[in-house]
Each structure stands twice: as structure tokens, then as C-alpha cells.
UniProtKB/Swiss-Prot annotation:
The keyword Repeat applies. Residues 1-166 form the SPX domain. Transmembrane segments: none annotated. PROSITE patterns: ANK_REP_REGION, ANK_REPEAT, GP_PDE, SPX. It comes from Neurospora crassa (strain ATCC 24698 / 74-OR23-1A / CBS 708.71 / DSM 1257 / FGSC 987). The gene is nuc-2. Disulfide bonds: none annotated. Keywords: ANK repeat, Repeat. One of its GO terms (biological process) is lipid metabolic process. One of its GO terms (molecular function) is phosphoric diester hydrolase activity. This is Ankyrin repeat protein nuc-2. Residues 923-963 are annotated as: Disordered.
Length: 1066
């Protein structure tokens, strides 16, 4: 989100601070104005001829004092607001702490039904919320100062940001986090103590004793007073009218002659009346009122609610009518800035809305501390009748300022068709909210009721409207969020799927990036209507823009590159070569990932009671840095990785803290046996969260992946060269692109999986036909597997395989794909100098569960070690035989866990993660490839020639293919230093912009055309193919490997040949 929109959204969320935010937009305009129209001539240019214009940098330097004068005033405004709010919060906290101490002074336990307990607990929770708002105000303004100073430095070519922040901004009280942290800790401690006292545990979580004199601001002057309050409330709630009258009579009889007891009694009865509005019977409330001791005008001194607030919250019509008849103020606001009408609208009290508006009509448009009017409260809680009544009473339907909520937008966001239609009938305008989103964007993003889109169009909404946030249309929002019904409704109403956003990306790009297959299917026919274009070139770098004219001043864009170079060294012209990657020598990697499966990763049993905002993951190991994760989890914070020395003694502590503070809310620990007991070195774990009193108050769930170092003897780095890749980064703000690598030439693809006893064997499918029954390969031992495949091996003289030339690499692939031998045998049978791409088939957890098979060899570490041992032994043997030549090896797999393990265990060979997203009719192709006649029938007497002829007519498809979002595979590849990705050519043809997106993360890209028959790429095929398909087409009668499109590093063909570009150092 753009920072300017972010500030506007935050102003909407905390309206009481809105006027004190940094005027970020005005400061940006000021920089632009000062750079274009200088006020003062620079002192260094006194001999400049009159009328001669100034260049941008000189103009800004001349007006430096003007800019920083304005910055200082903005800083004063922010700091003054903070100092005032901090003082108010300190006073509130002292009052709450005094009340808590007085509450604790009772000899009996504190009941949850106690009047003061409930209001005091609510008071502390409200204090925490207000404290969080203050800290958010400080954070967003601190970011604003940092960003605007960065823009100034960039435009003026100066270095003032860090100096000004450290010497001016950070010296102000507003940017000292210590005070807010201490206040947060005190409030969190008090909430924990209140909960303990209510359960009968007289404990204290104070870090130090406090011997200060307790000054109570409430009328609980002693134990007897507190007990009397509780006893009277219990009697009222019991509904025993006779006992209640008798108790009140006895209380009146004890009145002192001077009348002091009458005042105390009246306050006690008033407190009891307010507390019993919720559950007290009508008769009991009347008894209290008949005593004449109830001060009907009073309000609670913590939440500041009077009887009208309480009646509206709990739906007590009798109290509301009685209070209004006695002249109780209907305009009084409570601690949340709400009047009784807010609560009546919030809870759908239609009759109360009429009564309150008759008593005070001007409250209809009052806003509370959440910037909600009564109408907005009714909308977000879907109270249709209340919305209608408020509109009849002329409630404001459109915002009056940028900091107001837009009722129509909120109704669209919450998916109420009836309320949206009602608002539109009353003339609601189609407006953008503080984020720059129109109603149609919110409907498409939330995806609840696509019918609203049709309704909005009937009232004049443009369904191709571009928002002011990202430049997205509603169609892009629906595609990005995977909202299929909304996407379908938009397409049916004629929305244009080819509109590009501000990054020149279509809706299809975001659907593919997020992995929404159904959305991609809907967008594909619409995309075909527009002629495809050639793959756009990838701009890895480029020439400097033309020098700006110095003869005339011009307004300068803040984001433009200045023509005058800074006094810094230029970036290197030669791309940086990176040899190999980080790998495990003796350490073990433990990866913790928090994925949202069926439930939230971190869950409290009483939602809203514990204001958790920060998770800290730490270990007792001194060399491990704790991981701090801001909640809720974001895409870039869902994975935490630790490298440890010993898994046997490894523990992880999970601690949950409030937003700003160091007081632990909840804690748990993962013991070593949890990690040791994981099947296949991976699994899911769920741990209880305990509060300081060791009560389970929630749970935390996460996936664990353990990667151990290679158990065998690795290849020596000094004897065996690692692969390398060259990357270019032309400035610090651009992404890193792979411009070349040591991978070149042709690689034969072989499919490897494991047997029951953990031996890597060659077979492209999970099952093998044995006597008409498909048996999983992983359930067979090596001896059993060799018995089943013996007939196929007997048909071919395997010794002749080593005599094949490099031009026969496709024949080698076909032979090895259905011959059923071990990986060890295959590597020694391959012709000298023929490189190999080892495609590893390893089932995911879902595939294992579906196959109902689990063997000892399923452990990813054992299987990866078995493969690497074979490859390493072959490399050593080949080096001993021919020191000048070593076979190049590439690993690839659709399983991200296996790719991660293979990459962490060695630095010598690159690893590619495959993704099958975008392949057309993938399941049908797999079924066809596994049917009779595709390889299993070769166990009979079919000749090698007939098998080769049949293979020419069909495309061999392996099992284990997996579809993932581009976002997920890119994140996995970059976080684990993989070489790159292998993606389906059809996907890249539909969304060419994905090439740029993948390459910008420093990943190599291979186009996978293995799912397409050879005939589909011939010149004789019916339709001319464009984009990647066109660039890779023309196979009949021409070079089967034409020059790859720019940005593509390799091509995987259906004949099992992987070809990389010849390396050119750019």
C-alpha cells in the first residue's frame, strides 16, 4: 500500500488523532514546489546572471531552511499531541490501579459478578486499546518523517535524513518507547491479576512491592462495604423480592443520625442498580427505584456509562423509558465516545432508536472513537430495519470529510445486499474510501455476495473503475483474492479482463501469482479474445536517461533519477558470480512454518481477551538469535529457521507479548522429543499456551521441517568445482537478475524414486503393473522391483547404452524411463559426457495419506542422503577414470521439501523446484500416460522398436506433479537458495509478466514443455502460436531448440531433453 494511503487509513481508524498526523502530502508538495520555483538564490551562485534559472539541487539547497522549518512545525504538532495523550493515559492508569488496590482489600474473594470487577476489567482493556492507538500514532508518524526526509535527500542530493532523525526526531518524548512499554506492562499485569483474583487466587504479578498509600476513589472504604455491595447485588439477581426488601429495610435502619450512612447507602444502591440492569428482574429494579435512593442521573466512574447506555446495551426498555422520563442525558458519551443511540443501533434495538432520537435528534450523526456513526454500527452488524429507520430520520448517508467512513462501502464490504440496495435507493453516492477503494472493489475483494456487483452497475457504478490504491479494477481484486463467484459475475457483466494496473499487469497475472486455478480458467477464454503479443523484453539494466536540460527549471518527480550523479562508486559492470550456495556441514536446520490450514496458527480460547500482538521464538542455545514476529502473521513472517548443533537437546520457547511491552501474556515450549518423534523429519505440532498461572488459554500450531547434514562423505570443494550463477543489480533499489550460469548444453532427464529399503531406482510413476495389479514402488524391496522389471531389462542390451552419442539423448531418455534399474546403474551406463537432470519423485503428505503407504524410506533426509551418496560416488569414480571430465548433474522435483533437503545438504549441484500450474487437462494426460500401452505393458514381449514408436506418438508423463502458486514456489526457492524454477510453458504463455517476476528474485527460469506432444510444436499445427509458445515453436524441419526468449534460461522438452542457454556474460 502506498504510504500516503496508509496514513489516510490510519487517520480513519484513530479519528481523535487525525488532526495531529504529519501532513505528509503537503510536505511532498512542498519539496516539489521548492525544487521548481526557488525563492532565494543560493549563496554559492552569487555571480549568476539575473533571470538565469536555477537547477533543482541548487534550488532545494537555497530553500533548505524553508523545508526544515515546516518539518519542525510538523514535529512539534505530533509531539504536543503525544505529550497530552500520555499525560491523560497516566492519570487514567493511576485511577485504575487505585481502584484495583481497593478492590483487593476485601477479605473475601473477588467475584466475577461484582460490579467493580466487571467495570474495572473493562477499564483496563480499554486502556490497553487506547495505549495501542497512541503507539500506532507514534509509529506511523515516525515512518512519515523518515520517508519524507529520504525524499528530500534523494531530490536535493543531500545526506540529512539519519542526522535529523537521530538528533532531532528521536530526542522528542513522542519517540521514546520506554514510557509506553512501562504503561503497557502495568496494564497487562493488572489484567492478569484481576483474572486470578476472580478465580480465588490471591496472587500478585508485581515485579516489585509497592508500599505507597492506597487512596481509593470509590466508595469501598472497607471490607464490610465491599461485602455489602456484593451481597446486595446477589440478592437483586436472585429475584427474591421479599429478601431484597428486607435487606434494604435493615440497611436503612442502620443509618447514622448525621446522615453520612444515607449517602453511602444511596451510592451503594445506585451502583447496584446500574450493575443489575443486565440480569435483574423488572420487579427487583422497581424495588430499588422505590427506595428513592437511586441517583438515576449517575454514571459509572470507569466506563462512564449511565443507565441509558446500560439499557441500550442489554435491551432493558423499562430502564430506558424510566431514565428518559426523568431527564437522563441521552447525549452523554462513555469512555468509547458512544452515546446510547450508538448501542441501540449496534444491538438492533429498533424501538429504542425511536425513543432516543425523539429525546435527542442531534445524536443521529455523532461519531464515536472508532469513527462510527449509529448508521455505520447498524450496517456492519447487518440490522436492516435499524438502517431503514435511521435513514427515515435523515441520518447522513455520505461522508463529509476524508476521515469519515463511507456507509455504502462498508455495506458492500460486509456483503449485505438488502442494505446496499436500501442505501442506493436513498441516494448514496459511489465514492472511494480512505484507501482509495470504491464499493465495487470492496465487493470483489471480500467475495461474499456477487449480486451486489450487478446492483451497483444498475445504479451507475463502473465495473472497470480503477482504484486509487494500486490502480486495480474490481476484476483484479477478485482474481487476486480467488473470489470465483465475483470474478464470474464481473465477466458476465462485461468487465474487461485485459485492463492493466499501474505496473502494467493484468488480472491473470495476480490469479497465477496467488495460485487461483479456477480464476485462471475463467480468465483464459477472455484472454484469448485479445491477440497475444510477443514476450516483452526483460530490462535487466539500461542506459542512463537523457540529461535534463539545465537551461530552464522544471518540476521534478520525487521518484525520478537525477541526472547529476552522486559522489558514489558506480555499480560493477561485470555481473557478480555466486559459487554454490550455503549448505549444512555439521549443523541441522529446523524450519518452523505457520500456515493457515483449517484454523489460525495462534488461537486464544477467549477471543479478544488477550491483546496479543507479538510472538517471540527463542531457544536456550546462546548462538541463536530470537525471532520476533508481529501478529497477525504476514507472508514474509510465516517461516522461522534455526541452525542448531544438536537436535537431542534442542528446545524452542514460544512467548506471546502485548503490542508494546515486555510482560508475557502466554508461553509454551517445544521439547526435544517433539522434534525427534516427527515422522519423515516433518510434521505438524500443536502446543497449548499457558498464562503466568499455568492455565491453558490458547494454542499455537505449526509445521516442522528438519533437515540434517549429509550423513555420508561429501564431495571435496577443492577437488570438485561447484556450479555458479551470475547476477546483476544495477542499483540498490532494483531486483537481482540471473544473467548467466555454469549450466549449458543438453541434459537427459531421468525419474528417480525409492524402494521400500531406501534404494533410489528409475521409474516415472508411483505404481508399477505386476500381474494386472498396480503396486506402489515404495512398497517393493529392490529385489522385488528388479523381479518385476526383469522382462524389460532383458529386451535391451544395456551395455550398448554407453555407446549412444549425444545426438541420441532423447532415445536414452525413453530407454531409461521404462527400464527399471537403480540410479547407480543408470549413471554408469550413461554415455560419457552426457549430462543428467535427476527428476526426483517424492510424495507429499497428502499423497502419502491417499496412497496409505508409509515406509522407513519415507524420511526425506534418508532418501536425499541415498541419492546424494550415489551421485557423489559416481562423481569420484568418474574423476578417477577421467580427471579432465565430470558429468554435470541437476536435481529437480515437484516436492518443495525434497528440494530444500537436497539443496541444504550439498553445494555442488543446483536444484530446481518444479511447478505444474497452467498445464491443460493435466489429470487426463496423466491418466492417458498411465494406461495400458504406455510402458507397463512392456513387461510383456513388446520389442524395443515398437516401444520407441509408441513413445513417439505419446508424451511420457511422470507422477508426482504438483500445482502451487507462483508466490509460494518463489518464496520457497529464494528462502532456501535454490537455483531456480521449472514452470509450465502454457502458464508463461498466458502470463508473460511472470518471467520478469520470477527473474527479479534472482532465480533461473526453465520452461517446461514436457506435457506437450511433439506435433503440437510443429510448423504444420493449425494455429500460429505467439509469446513463449511461438518463440519455442517451429520444430518440424528446423532446429528443435531455437533460441530461447529473453529471460528464459532453459527448455525442458517432451522428449526428456533439458537444454540450457549457452552462457553469455552481459
Amino acid at each position: 500500500m502506498k504510504f500516503g494511503k496508509q496514513i489516510q487509513k490510519r487517520q480513519l481508524e484513530v479519528p481523535e488523532y487525525a488532526a495531529s498526523f504529519v501532513n505528509y502530502k503537503a510536505l511532498k508538495k512542498l519539496i516539489k514546489k521548492l525544487s521548481a520555483t526557488p525563492i532565494l538564490p543560493p549563496q554559492t551562485d552569487l555571480r549568476r546572471a539575473p533571470g538565469e534559472p536555477l537547477d533543482t539541487q541548487s534550488a532545494l539547497q537555497a530553500n533548505k531552511a524553508t523545508f526544515f522549518f515546516q518539518i519542525d512545525r510538523e514535529l512539534d504538532k505530533v509531539n504536543a499531541c503525544y505529550v497530552q495523550k500520555e499525560a491523560e493515559l497516566k492519570i487514567r492508569l493511576k485511577t485504575l490501579l487505585d481502584k484495583k488496590k481497593a478492590l483487593r482489600s476485601r477479605s473475601g474473594g473477588t467475584s466475577r459478578r461484582s460490579t467493580k470487577f466487571t467495570t474495572l476489567q473493562e477499564g483496563f482493556q480499554q486502556f490497553v486499546n487506547d495505549l495501542n492507538k497512541l503507539q500506532q500514532f507514534v509509529e506511523i508518524n515516525g515512518t512519515a518523517f523518515s520517508k519524507i526526509l529520504k525524499k528530500w535527500d534523494k531530490t536535493a542530493k543531500s545526506k540529512t535524513k539519519e542526522l535529523y532523525l537521530s538528533r532531532v526526531v528521536e530526542k522528542r518524548p513522542a519517540f521514546n518507547p520506554t514510557v509506553i512499554s512501562e504503561l503497557s506492562d502495568q496494564a497487562t499485569t493488572s489484567l492478569q491479576e484481576l483474572g486470578a483474583w476472580a478465580d480465588g487466587d490471591n496472587v500478585s504479578f508485581e515485579t516489585r512491592p509497592d508500599h505507597d498509600h492506597v487512596v481509593s476513589t470509590q466508595h469501598l472504604l472497607g471490607t464490610d462495604e465491599g461485602d455489602a455491595d456484593t451481597l446486595l447485588l446477589d440478592t437483586v439477581l436472585s429475584g427474591n423480592i421479599d429478601s431484597l426488601k428486607d435487606m434494604l429495610d435493615r440497611m436503612k435502619a442502620t443509618a447514622a443520625p448525621d446522615g453520612s450512612a444515607d449517602v453511602s447507602l444511596a451510592e451503594r444502591v445506585t451502583r447496584t442498580f446500574l450493575a443489575s440492569i443486565n440480569e435483574g428482574s423488572l420487579e427487583a429494579l422497581k424495588v430499588l427505584l422505590d427506595t428513592g435512593l437511586v441517583d438515576i442521573q449517575s454514571w459509572d466512574d470507569i466506563n462512564e456509562r449511565n443507565c441509558l447506555h446500560q439499557a441500550a446495551i442489554y435491551g432493558n426498555s423499562f430502564v430506558l423509558e424510566y431514565g428518559l422520563s426523568k431527564g437522563v442525558d441521552a447525549e452523554r458519551t462513555d469512555a468509547y465516545g458512544r452515546v446510547p443511540l450508538h448501542y441501540a443501533s449496534m444491538h438492533g434495538r429498533l424501538d429504542m432508536i425511536d425513543a432516543l432520537l425523539n429525546a435527542s435528534p442531534k445524536t443521529i450523526n455523532l461519531i464515536d472513537h472508532d469513527n462510527f456513526t449509529p448508521l455505520v454500527h447498524s450496517i456492519v452488524r447487518n440490522h436492516l430495519e435499524c438502517v431503514g429507520r435511521l435513514l427515515e430520520r435523515s441520518a447522513r448517508i455520505d461522508p463529509v470529510s476524508d476521515t469519515d467512513h463511507v456507509p455504502l462501502n462498508l455495506a458492500c464490504q460486509h456483503g449485505s445486499v438488502a442494505i446496499v440496495e436500501l442505501l442506493l435507493k436513498h441516494g448514496a453516492k459511489i465514492l472511494a474510501d480512505a484507501e482509495g477503494l470504491y464499493p465495487q472493489h470492496l465487493v470483489a475483494r471480500s467475495g461474499q455476495t456477487p449480486e451486489i456487483l450487478v446492483l451497483l452497475k444498475q445504479y451507475g457504478a463502473d465495473l472497470d473503475q480503477i482504484d486509487k490504491l494500486y490502480g486495480w479494477t474490481p476484476l483484479v481484486h477478485a482474481a487476486s483474492e480467488g473470489n470465483v463467484p465475483c470474478l464470474q459475475a464481473l465477466l458476465e457483466t462485461g468487465a474487461d479482463p485485459n485492463i492493466l494496473d499501474e505496473k502494467d499487469l493484468p488480472a491473470m497475472y495476480y490469479a497465477a501469482w496467488e495460485g487461483h486455478l479456477e480464476c485462471m480458467k475463467l480468465l483464459t477464454p477472455a484472454k484469448k479474445e485479445k491477440a497475444a503479443s510477443e514476450l516483452p523484453p526483460i530490462h535487466i539494466g539500461g542506459a542512463l536517461p537523457p540529461m535534463a536540460s539545465s537551461t530552464a527549471p522544471m518540476p521534478m518527480s520525487l521518484d525520478a533519477i537525477d541526472p547529476i550523479p552522486a559522489l558514489e562508486l558506480p555499480p560493477p559492470i561485470i555481473p557478480l558470480r555466486r559459487y554454490g550456495h550455503n549448505f549444512l556441514d555439521t549443523k541441522t536446520v529446523v524450519q518452523i512454518s505457520f500456515e493457515e490450514d483449517s484454523e489460525q496458527p495462534l488461537l486464544f480460547f477467549q477471543d479478544g481477551k488477550y491483546p496479543a500482538a507479538r510472538l517471540t521464538i527463542s531457544s536456550k542455545s546462546s548462538d541463536l538469535i530470537p525471532k520476533n514476529i508481529i501478529l497477525p502473521f504476514q507472508e514474509d513472517t510465516r517461516v522461522a529457521s534455526f541452525q542448531i548443533d544438536n537436535l537431542e537437546s534442542f528446545t524452542l520457547d514460544f512467548e506471546v507479548f502485548p503490542t508494546y511491552g515486555a510482560k508475557v501474556i502466554a508461553k509454551t515450549v517445544a521439547l526435544p522429543n517433539i522434534f525427534r518423534a516427527l515422522l519423515s523429519s516433518s510434521g505438524k505440532c500443536c502446543l497449548p499456551l499457558f498464562d503466568p498461572r499455568l492455565r491453558a488459554i490458547g494454542q499455537i500450531s505449526f509445521h516442522v521441517q528438519i533437515i540434517k547434514p549429509f550423513s555420508g562423505t561429501p564431495l571435496e570443494i577443492t577437488d570438485f568445482e561447484t556450479y555458479w550463477k551470475a547476477t546483476s543489480q544495477f542499483d540498490t533499489n532494483t531486483s537481482t537478475f540471473v544473467t548467466g550460469s555454469s549450466l549449458s548444453g543438453d541434459f537427459v532427464q531421468i525419474y528417480v524414486q525409492h524402494t521400500k529399503d531406501g534404494v533410489p531406482v528409475l521409474w516415472p510413476r508411483w505404481t508399477i503393473n505386476c500381474g494386472g495389479i498396480d503396486v506402489p514402488v515404495s512398497t517393493l524391496t529392490l529385489a522385488q522391483f528388479q523381479t518385476v522389471t526383469a522382462a524389460a531389462r532383458n529386451r535391451i542390451n544395456l551395455s550398448e547404452l554407453s555407446t549412444y552419442t549425444l545426438d541420441q539423448i532423447a532415445d536414452v531418455h525413453r530407454i531409461l524411463a521404462n527400464i527399471g534399474i537403480t540410479l547407480h546403474e543408470a549413471l554408469f551406463l550413461l554415455p560419457k559426457g552426457m549430462h543428467v537432470n535427476i527428476q526426483v519423485l517424492y510424495p507429499t503428505a497428502d499423497e502419502k495419506a491417499e496412497a496409505k503407504s508409509s515406509t522407513a524410506a519415507d524420511d526425506v533426509n534418508e532418501f536425499a542422503d541415498a541419492i546424494l551418496s550415489v551421485v557423489f560416488d559416481h562423481a569420484r569414480a568418474q574423476r578417477a577414470e577421467r580427471p579432465d571430465s565430470v558429468r554435470s548433474v541437476v536435481f529437480s522435483s515437484y516436492n518443495p521439501t525434497l528440494c530444500t533437503a537436497l539443496n541444504w545438504k550439498q553445494p555442488n549441484f543446483p536444484v530446481f523446484l518444479c511447478n505444474d500450474m497452467g498445464r491443460e487437462d493435466r489429470k487426463q494426460q496423466q491418466q492417458g500416460s498411465c494406461s495400458k500401452g504406455d510402458g507397463d505393458e512392456d513387461m510383456g514381449g513388446t520389442t524395443a522398436a515398437s516401444r520407441r514408436e509408441a513413445a513417439d506418438e505419446r508424451t511420457l508423463q511422470s507422477d508426482g506433479r504438483r500445482t502451487s502458486s507462483i508466490k509460494d514456489v518463489v518464496r520457497t526457492a529464494t528462502s532456501n537458495n535454490l537455483m531456480g524454477l521449472i514452470c509450465c510453458s502454457r502458464l508463461l504463455d498466458m502470463v508473460p509478466a511472470l518471467v520478469d517476476a520470477i527473474k527479479s528474485h534472482g532465480l533461473a527460469l526453465v520452461v517446461d514443455k514436457s506435457g506437450e506432444p511433439e506435433a503440437a510444436n510443429s510448423k504444420d499445427s493449425g494455429d500460429k502460436q505467439l509469446g513463449i509458445s511461438g518463440a519455442l515453436g517451429g520444430l518440424a524441419g528446423s532446429d528443435p531448440f531455437p533460441k530461447l526468449p529473453k529471460g528464459v534460461d532453459g527448455l525442458l522438452k517432451s522428449n526428456g531433453v533439458l537444454r540450457f542457454n549457452e552462457y553469455i556474460d552481459v
